[in-house]
């Protein structure tokens, strides 16, 4: 049994998010400066979704997923404030409760990004996200 009050407790929770480096263009829009360099940003969870995952090999019988929308407020290279949100981020995959966990995952990703296949990455993500439900 999943206690949904735990999911509701995630709203407004401060977390740490692994994502691409962000910047602001001259039209004041936030954009991804680098698809190859990831950093850790502090964020706040604004939305929680729990759904039955999807697996290409198993159809609609994949692992359950818990995704969140996070709001990030940070500064760019010039010191100007940047605000953006990231929808559908996976808990324990790109969103972490502690900065130390995010740093460990980022170090792992940086050291293995060129050696893992797409399938291996998805399996690892499914396993880490399933820990939210206590099934991994």
Model-assigned labels for residue ranges:
Residues 1-11, 129:
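Mixed-charge, Lys/Arg-rich low-complexity intrinsically disordered regions
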Residues 56-136:
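Intrinsically disordered, low-complexity, charged/polar segments
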